[in-house]
Curated annotation (Swiss-Prot):
It catalyses: S-ubiquitinyl-[E2 ubiquitin-conjugating enzyme]-L-cysteine + [acceptor protein]-L-lysine = [E2 ubiquitin-conjugating enzyme]-L-cysteine + N(6)-ubiquitinyl-[acceptor protein]-L-lysine. Its EC number is 2.3.2.27. It is an enzyme of class 2 (transferase). PROSITE patterns: ZF_RING_2 (PS50089). InterPro entries: Znf_RING, Znf_RING/FYVE/PHD. Belongs to the RING-type zinc finger family. ATL subfamily. It comes from Arabidopsis thaliana. The gene is ATL64. It is found in: Membrane. GO terms for molecular function: transferase activity; zinc ion binding. This is RING-H2 finger protein ATL64. Pathway: Protein modification; protein ubiquitination. Gene3D superfamilies: Zinc/RING finger domain, C3HC4 (zinc finger).
Length: 227
């Protein structure tokens, strides 16, 4: 009996040693999982806080730019874009799944901030530049060109050249303002026969009486030529 008891003692000692080792390893694993979980939570909190600060900074910049553009729109010298033209500019919703082409920038040139998820923007048809809806609408209250390239948004008015129109069509002047009417000479007939008879029947008349008639002047000139 004494020999059997002595042989079983080291076996029970090894079992107790291994069980204590498993318990220690379990505690280490549990503590490492807890530390990793806390670290992930802290990283997520820091990321969300940094993103909130970034959005807050962008909002402040947008507000400053809007206030500045409103002051500019108050001046009468600036020409605003027509509301009908502004309504025709397409609006898009930004998504990281469908980013713009690489040659285009993913930021608004008015507020100098990047587009975020589900941000609404306007795409100018001529130059292809994109801006936030609020930023570009505020800009077009005082301007009618692109903020980035200064390209006109609405088509220019058609100007007719005066040189081409004058060469193709003759100039006409209105006759309503004329006080005198044109004289019709078609119905006027000069009768010289009476003047000849009158001068032949009375040859002794002086030249002064005959000079009153235009026919006598013509006959006197003929007589001078015949002489």
């Amino acid at each position: 009996m004494g020999i059997g008891e002595e042989s079983t003692k080291p076996i029970w000692g090894s079992v107790s040693h291994t069980s204590s080792g498993y318990a220690l390893n379990g505690k280490i694993m549990l503590s490492s999982v807890i530390v990793l979980f806390v670290a992930v939570i802290m990283i997520l909190c820091f990321h969300s806080y940094a993103r909130w600060l970034f959005r807050r900074h962008n909002r402040r910049i947008r507000r400053r730019i809007r206030s500045h553009l409103r002051t500019l729109s108050a001046s009468p010298r600036d020409q605003a874009l027509d509301q009908a033209v502004l309504d025709k500019i397409p609006i898009f919703v930004y998504s990281s799944k469908n980013p713009p082409p690489p040659e285009e920038k993913e930021e608004c040139s008015v507020c100098l901030s990047e587009f975020e998820e589900e941000d609404e923007g306007r795409l100018l048809p001529k130059c292809g530049h994109s801006f936030h809806v609020d930023c570009i609408d505020t800009w077009f209250r005082s301007r009618s060109t692109c903020p980035l390239c200064r390209a006109p948004v609405q088509p220019p008015f058609q100007v007719i050249e005066t040189g081409s129109s004058s060469s193709s069509s003759p100039l006409t002047f209105p006759t309503e303002g004329c006080e005198r009417e044109p004289i019709d000479l078609a119905g006027i007939i000069v009768d010289i026969s009476r003047e000849v008879e009158f001068e032949g029947s009375n040859p002794g008349l002086p030249i002064e009486n005959g000079s009153k008639f235009p026919g006598s002047r013509v006959l006197s000139l003929k007589r001078l030529w015949s002489i």
